[in-house]
Amino acid sequence: VSCPIDIDPRAQDAIAALPAEALLALAEALAVLELAPGGAGRSVNPDLNPDAAVRNLPFGGTGMITYLVLERDRRVDVLLITWA
């Protein structure tokens, strides 16, 4: 069962600014998030709270998706997209 993904407007702006070579990797990472959000990434604070709802998922070698898993709503909110 897939979870819908909601992308924050700031993350949408970051996506619009990504280089073309990052877009396929991002699409693949978002597909993984849709199918397995809790197991896809790693907690933003793995030492103190490994099961945290706010997680990071790397993509494309230098990209990072920061997202929130809303288990109750069966939804994923993408908060930030970064590319270095």
Listing of model-derived features with the role each one plays in the protein:
Residues 1-64, 69-84:
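Basic, Lys/Arg-enriched alpha-helical interface segments
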